[in-house]
Structure formats: C-alpha cells, structure tokens
C-alpha cells in the first residue's frame, strides 16, 4: 500500500474529514474551469428539456476531483447519487442490484470504471443506451433471458486510465471530460478554503508555499495542510505563516518543487550511478529498491510532467532542468 505523503491516491485515514472538505456546488469548486464550464452548460440544457444528463466520463490523474464532480453533478441536477467502484462489481448480479435501486434521474457513479470486466460492460451497454437490463438465468437449453426496464439515469464514470476502456464502452458516454493538474494559484485558493473549514488562520504566502509543493493536486494540498496544522498545533498557534509552513514542509522532506525523498533518491541514482541515463526501468528499480510498476505508475508521472525526467527508446534520462535543481551542473563545471 502506497502511504507516501505526496501520493495522489486516496488514503484510508482521510475518509472522515475528506467529505466535509468537498465542495457541493459549482460555485464552490475551484479550478478545472473548462470542464466545469462545459458541465454547467450541459446540466442547464438537460434541466431546460426536463431530461436526464447524458452519461459522463471523467478522466485524468488521481486526486483532481472526479468524485467531487460526480457529487456536484447530482446536486446541480437535484437528484440522488449511488456510488460504487469497478472492482466491487464482480458478477452480473452485483450490477443488477445497484441498477434496480436507481430512482428516475439518479446519478450512478462508478470509480475506476476501467476495471470493469468485459462481461459486466456488455450488461451495461443496454442499460446505458435503452435503460433496460437483460438478465440470463439457467444454463444450456434451460437458459432464459429476462428484460428489466430501468428508469432514465446518468452514469458518471471516473478513470485514471482512459486508454484501458474498451471502445464500445467509451463511445456510449455523451460527455467526456479530461481533468488537468491545477495551477499554483488555484491550489493556494483551495488551501485557504480548507484552512477556513479547519478554523485556521493562514496567510496568502503560506497558502502559496503549500500549493507550490502539492504536485498540482488538491488531495495532496489538503494532506500537506493537515500536517502543517499538526506542527502549528504543537507550536501552540492557529496562525500559519510562511516561515511555519516552509519549516514544517522541510521537516517532512518535501522540497520547494514538490519532490520528496523517493523522488530525490530516484533522480540522484540516475545521475550518480548512470551518468544521467539512459537507464532501463528494471535496472533503475533494482538500484533504488522499488518495484518497476510502482516507479512507472506512481513516481514517474509527476517527474515527466514537470520536466525532471524523459523517456527515450533506450531508457529513462534525467533532464538538464533536474541537474540544475540538484546542483549537478555546478559540480560538472
């Protein structure tokens, strides 16, 4: 289980507070202006026609607000929401049980929708297109099919891996929206909003310091704020200034560009052991004692996005920007 402070994945201990931090309406939702603006138009149009909203696919890196947007869609449409995840729907009966509880207009949110089996996908197709469910019971010559009518509903699917969705499933979504990494000023606004909910006083500069180290991800920004709050509480203050915030983050080994100890170890190994690369993924994994899949799925995306690392046909290479950040250029000179 990935328990990195800078992990974009949801961590179990965050459940109790996370829901209370989530915005409930578009006007409270910071960032993702393009996706938010388009969704708002589609929702208003559906309401004007007294129709259900088309099925929506949200994709992008973890921690950017896909689950929150699904809840906001339901709130803005004035309907209920049922929430599940791809791995939880193992058998046709699991899907039938969920679909049979939907009220007219409800939102069904399926997180990690790319992890649905092909069998479940095929049952989902008529449910999405014709609002009906075909259930087969019995085997061989005794097999019988029963069609169950469903109320109109909106399926909101969320995935971090849109490419893993089958084309037939992907094509049945009328609305497809990509969520992008957040800008620093957007994350600073999120940190300030969360601090207010925590009844903390935080300066704009301190919010900015936390935002810069949050890897473009609200989930990480809120997690870092929780840890900075711990340092503030032990120091006997409810006021977070830039000095306190920066000191706390330094002690947590999160540098000014949002890199932690694992990132440092990976990038330094590439320079000090392999001259900056190219180096193969398996070789790099063995060198730093990490799983190759974990490096590829968890560590690399941010390093690639920020220009610290590049992939080539011959392997991974560190960039000049990364060398400058770690001071290797000066040493070479």
UniProtKB/Swiss-Prot annotation:
DNA binds at residues 311, 316. Keywords: ATP-binding, Cytoplasm, DNA damage, DNA recombination, DNA repair, DNA-binding, Hydrolase, Nucleotide-binding. One of its GO terms (biological process) is DNA repair. It catalyses: ATP + H2O = ADP + phosphate + H(+). The keyword DNA-binding applies. Residues 256-333 are annotated as: Head domain (RuvB-H). Has 3 domains, the large (RuvB-L) and small ATPase (RuvB-S) domains and the C-terminal head (RuvB-H) domain. The head domain binds DNA, while the ATPase domains jointly bind ATP, ADP or are empty depending on the state of the subunit in the translocation cycle. During a single DNA translocation step the structure of each domain remains the same, but their relative positions change. PANTHER family: HOLLIDAY JUNCTION BRANCH MIGRATION COMPLEX SUBUNIT RUVB, PTHR42848. This is Holliday junction branch migration complex subunit RuvB. It comes from Exiguobacterium sp. (strain ATCC BAA-1283 / AT1b). The gene is ruvB.
């Amino acid at each position: 289980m990935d328990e990195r402070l800078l992990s974009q994945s949801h961590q179990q201990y965050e459940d109790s507070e996370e829901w209370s931090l989530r915005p409930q309406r578009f006007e409270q939702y910071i960032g993702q202006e393009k996706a938010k603006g388009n969704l708002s138009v589609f929702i208003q149009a559906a309401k004007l026609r007294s129709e259900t909203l088309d099925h929506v696919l949200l994709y992008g890196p973890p921690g950017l607000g896909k689950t929150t947007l699904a809840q906001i869609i339901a709130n803005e449409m004035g309907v209920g929401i049922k929430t599940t995840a791809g791995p939880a729907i193992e058998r046709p009966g699991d899907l039938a049980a969920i679909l049979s509880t939907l009220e007219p207009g409800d939102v069904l949110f399926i997180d990690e929708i790319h992890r649905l089996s092909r069998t479940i996908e095929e049952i989902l197709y008529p449910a999405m297109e014709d609002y009906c469910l075909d259930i087969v019971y019995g085997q061989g010559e005794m097999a019988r099919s029963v069609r169950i009518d469903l109320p109109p509903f909106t399926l909101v699917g969320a995935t971090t891996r849109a490419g893993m969705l089958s084309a037939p499933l992907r094509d049945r979504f009328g609305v497809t929206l990509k969520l992008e990494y957040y800008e620093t000023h957007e994350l600073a606004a999120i940190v300030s909003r969360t601090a207010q909910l925590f009844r903390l006083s935080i300066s704009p500069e301190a919010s900015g310091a936390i935002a810069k180290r949050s890897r473009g991800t609200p989930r990480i920004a809120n997690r870092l704020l929780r840890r900075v709050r711990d340092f503030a509480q032990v120091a006997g203050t409810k006021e977070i200034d830039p000095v306190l915030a920066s000191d706390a983050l330094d002690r947590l080994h999160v540098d000014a560009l949002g890199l932690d100890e694992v990132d440092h170890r990976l990038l330094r190994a590439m320079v000090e052991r392999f001259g900056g690369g190219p180096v193969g993924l398996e070789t790099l994994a063995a060198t730093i004692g990490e799983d190759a899949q974990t490096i590829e799925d968890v560590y690399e995306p941010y390093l690639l996005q920020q220009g610290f690392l590049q992939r080539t046909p011959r392997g991974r290479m560190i960039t000049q920007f990364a060398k400058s950040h770690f001071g290797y250029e000066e040493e070479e000179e």
